[in-house]
Amino acid sequence: MKTGRNYKFWFCTGSQDLYGDECLRKVAEHSCIIVEELNKSGMFPYEIIWKPTLITNELIRKTFNEANADEDCAGVITWMHTFSPAKSWILGLKEYRKPLCHLHTQFNQEIPYDTIDMDFMNENQSAHGGREYGHMVTRMGIERKVIAGHWADKKIQERLASWMRTAVGIMESSHIRVCRVADNMRNVAVTEGDKVEAQMKFGWEIDAYPVNEIAEYVQDVSQGDIDVLVEEYYNKYDMILDGRDPEEFKKHVAVQAGIEIGFERFLEEKNYQAIVTHFGDLGSLKQLPGLAIQRLMEKGYGFGGEGDWKTAAMVRLMKIMAAGKKDARGTSFMEDYTYNLVPGKEGILEAHMLEVCPSVADGKVSMRVCPLSMGDREDPARLVFTSKTGPGIATSLVDLGDRFRLLINEVECKKTEKPMPALPVGTAFWTPKPDLSTAAEAWILAGGAHHTAFTYDLTAEQMGDWAAAMGIEAVYIDGDTTIRNLQNELRWNSMYFSK
C-alpha cells in the first residue's frame, strides 16, 4: 500500500541586491552548505532541494508558482539570510498554495566578537530580515510554521523534520478517498458528519457502496489465493484454538482471508485508501470483517467502525504522516471501552469488537476464532494482542454542526496490572494526560467521540499544525490542561471558528 509520493522540500533564501555581488555570493554559498548538511544529517524524512537566492519580486513569484506546479514539492522552507524587503514577497506568497515554513536561523551560531564589522552585520541579519518577512506573512493571514534557532541544533532539525511530516499530511489529505460499506450505525450521533464540508475542508472524498457490491469481490476470490494467504497467517501468527477442532478453526480463518483479498482488490480497483464497515449491514458476508480489516490497516489503509468515516480518514492520514519513520511503533483505530478507576492505577482500556491494527502490538500476535454477538454471523477470526507501552496521542475529529473540531489528547500507554485471557481482541491501556478524571471531563466538554485515531509516532504539535492548515479548531488535552482554562478556550473558539 503506497503511503504518498516521494516528496521533496524546497529551500528558498531571501536577500536583496543592496549589499553587492560578494555578499550575494556568500548568501548562496551559506544556503548551499546548510542544505547539504541538513540532508547529510540523516534527520529528515524527505530530501531538501536548494534553490537560487530570491532577490526580486519576479523571481520570488516565479519560484513559488514553480513550487505549486511541481507535484513532488510538498512545501517551501524560507530563510531570510539578509534583510529582504517584504513587499517583494507579496505576489509570490499570495499565489502560493502549499505548506510554508519560516526557518528563522542564521549561518553562524556565535557572534564573531573579535572580527565583527558592518560587512558582517549586513550579510548576517536574519534577526532583522526574518521579522520583516514574518510581519508580511502575518499581515497576509497566511498559515505557516515558524521555527527559530540555529540550523545545526539537533532540536531545531527535529522540529523541521517533524513539520515535514505535517506538510506531507496537508498535501496528501486531498488524496484520501473513503469507501463506506453501508451507512452509519443507526441512532449514533458522533459518527455522523457533513461529507460535503469535509471534502471542502480536507479534500476527502467519501463514497458509499452497497455491501453486496464489495461482497461480490470476496466471492470471486479463488480457493488457491485463499489457501496461500491462510498459509501466511499460520506461519506468522500463533493459533489459539480454544478447544475448537483445527479444521473447523481453519475454515473460519479462511473466510477472513477471502474478505481481506476481496476488500483489497476492490479498494485498489476503485482507488480508495480507507474503508468503514458496520456490523448491522453485512449483506452476504459470512463474518464481520475482523482479521481482514486489521491486516488492511497494517498495510496502510484507514478504518472506522460503525460507518465512522471521519476516523477512517484520520487513521489513513496519520499513517501517511508517520510513513517511513525509523522505529515506528504503530497507528490504529481505537475505541474507549471501559475504565480502571482504582486510585493510582487509573486508565482506559482501549479496544474494539475486532478491528485494532497489529502495528501497535507488543510482541507476538495471536489469532483466535470466537463468538461475536453483534452482526449475527459466523464466529469471526481476529488478531489478539496487547499494545506497546509509552507515549502516544489519541485524536478525534468531530462535526459540531457549524464547524469541525479536532481533539488531541496526549496519553501514556501502560501494561494492564493482570492479563485478560477471556478478552479475545487487540487492546491498549492508557492513562490520558493530565490525569483520567481531568482528561475525561475535558474530552466530554469538548464533544469528543468514543472512537479515536491513535498513534505512537506523531505529536500533538504535528496534528495541531495540520488542523491549523485546514482552518479548523484544535483542542489540546495535555499535562497543562485545567477544566477552567479549557472551558474558557472552548468559549473563545466558538466565537472565532463559528460561521
Regions found by a protein language model. Give the residues of each.
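Extended hydrophobic packing segments that form well-structured cores
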Residues: G375-K499
